[in-house]
A protein has these predicted regions:
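Conserved alpha/beta core of the MobA/IspD/sugar-nucleotide pyrophosphorylase nucleotidyltransferase superfamily
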Residues: 1-31
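Mg2+-dependent phosphoryl-transfer enzymes with acidic/Ser/Thr/Gly-rich catalytic loops
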Residues: 58-65, 92, 98-100, 104-107, ...
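Active-site phosphate/pyrophosphate-handling residues
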Residues: 7-10, 70-73, 115, 139-142
Length: 189
């Protein structure tokens, strides 16, 4: 991309937001799986925008994108399960998962996320190649290696974007999960 003036900027920004795939030239990307049985999603930085508000008594509050829930329910109707897999220990993860109608496994040690993912797949008898993982931070990288397709939110850390098979146009907490759901639902039609 060569930006010489403001009109170039607007043109290329429109191109990116219209669905241009952002990739790392050194990474061999895998295609979206033909069959998807499960989407595993990180919580902070995917369902939320990675920010937290703390009041004077230490209670934490987050914000989530409500429209994610609508598309998650549609995925479940076509037989694709969704599970939140998070290192976050706060009960807000369970509360949001319940509202979304999905299972949440949270409080997972940062260095054990990949192991926990493998255990989920074993218990549910799901092949890794039929799993999509969406994340944003370096503790998600072991899950990226296991999943059949790894997806990064637009504002993920550079190492995560480099490792991803696909990078969304939406940032975490602002419709990233819905964008992924839309992409998968469109493919399954």
């Amino acid at each position: 991309v060569d930006i010489d003036n403001l009109s170039d900027w607007a043109k290329y920004e429109a191109l990116v937001y219209s669905g241009l795939e952002i990739v790392s030239p050194g990474k061999k990307r895998r295609p979206i799986p033909e069959k998807i049985d499960l989407i595993l999603s990180d919580f902070d930085g995917v369902i939320t925008d990675n920010r937290v508000w703390v009041n004077q008594d230490g209670t934490e509050t987050i914000a989530a994108f409500r429209s994610d829930s609508v598309r998650v329910r549609e995925l479940r109707k076509v037989g694709i399960d969704v599970i939140i897999l998070s290192s976050e220990v706060n009960r807000v993860v369970e509360a949001r998962a319940k509202k979304m109608g999905v299972e949440a496994i949270h409080g997972v040690a940062l260095h054990e996320k990949g192991q926990v993912m493998q255990e989920i797949l074993r218990q549910k008898n799901i092949k890794a190649e039929n799993v999509v993982f969406i994340g944003n931070d370096i503790n998600d990288l072991p899950c990226f290696e296991i999943a059949g397709w790894s997806v990064a939110v637009a504002d993920a850390y550079p190492e995560v974007i480099h490792a991803a098979d696909f990078v969304l146009t939406k940032p975490g907490g602002h419709g990233a999960l819905r964008e992924l759901c839309d992409l998968i639902l469109k493919k399954s039609r």
